[in-house]
Amino acid sequence: NPLFGIAGEDGPTGPSGIVGQ
């Protein structure tokens, strides 16, 4: 999800960002 960044680990709403929550 762009909310967390651009590219990272999967988050609760799909691909998160740099944080990768």
UniProtKB/Swiss-Prot annotation:
Glycans are attached at residue 1. Residues 1-21 are annotated as: Disordered. An unusual glucose trisaccharide is attached to the N-terminal Asn that lacks the typical N-X-[ST] motif. The carbohydrate moiety is necessary for nephritogenic activity. Sequence repeats lie at residues 5-7, 8-10, 11-13, 14-16, 17-19. It comes from the Eukaryota. Residues 5-19 are annotated as: 5 X 3 AA tandem repeats of G-X-X. Keywords: Glycoprotein, Repeat. Can induce glomerulonephritis. This is Nephritogenoside. It comes from Rattus norvegicus.
